Amino acid sequence: MRIDIVTIFPACLDPLRQSLPGKAIESGLVDLNVHDLRRWTHDVHHSVDDAPYGGGPGMVMKAPVWGEALDEICSSETLLIVPTPAGVLFTQATAQRWTTESHLVFACGRYEGIDQRVVQDAARRMRVEEVSIGDYVLPGGESAAVVMVEAVLRLLAGVLGNPASHQDDSHSTGLDGLLEGPSYTRPASWRGLDVPEVLLSGDHARIAAWRREVSLQRTRERRPDLSHPD
């Protein structure tokens, strides 16, 4: 998989060189490239924004600069992802779907966003998805891009040491979209708090039933919108 990220703050993407994403890059499982949008500017000030038509606060990122950048980086096989609080909600299912893509490009906006014509123009040549990571607003799309890239990479074969590690994660299909229950490790007793007895029993059927029940309970309490009929 190839991933390109376009931004005016390349250093914001440095966390992707660490931990599991970093290992995926080093091992060749993913080809990650971060591009400074200002490279495609032509004025002495390297301007990437201008005042919005119709008035209003803030600045809007200019279409010509973004157009040149995407023309050079993208192809008809690209899935262009535009992080925006006005986008469709990013979920585990989204991350899973993107693992089948060969080329992801993230266009990280700033200020009041990117001129909408950039999205419209790109959609004539490739697939485009405007995506939000939650009902809140960030200064730019870089943090959202890091979140989404990490979510996708950990699902790629060979990234996690144990391929089964993500199969029973919260929101995963292996858990029917529910929240994962609590985890425990040694010691069995700590500061007067004991690990649930069932987890020490060695009875795999009982353990599976217990995990299912606490998963359902946690989901009902914390995310009733995800509640499961059983």
From Swiss-Prot:
Homodimer. It is an enzyme of class 2 (transferase). GO terms for biological process: tRNA N1-guanine methylation. Its EC number is 2.1.1.228. Its main location: cytoplasm. One of its GO terms (cellular component) is cytosol. It catalyses: guanosine(37) in tRNA + S-adenosyl-L-methionine = N(1)-methylguanosine(37) in tRNA + S-adenosyl-L-homocysteine + H(+). One of its GO terms (molecular function) is tRNA (guanine(37)-N1)-methyltransferase activity. Was identified as a high-confidence drug target. The lineage of its organism: Bacteria, Bacillati, Actinomycetota, Actinomycetes, Mycobacteriales. Specifically methylates guanosine-37 in various tRNAs. It comes from Mycobacterium tuberculosis (strain ATCC 25618 / H37Rv). This is tRNA (guanine-N(1)-)-methyltransferase. The keyword S-adenosyl-L-methionine applies. Belongs to the RNA methyltransferase TrmD family. It is found in: Cytoplasm. Signal peptide: none annotated. Pfam families: tRNA_m1G_MT. S-adenosyl-L-methionine binds at residues 109, 133-138. NCBIfam families: PRK00026.1, trmD. Keywords: Cytoplasm, Methyltransferase, S-adenosyl-L-methionine, Transferase, tRNA processing.
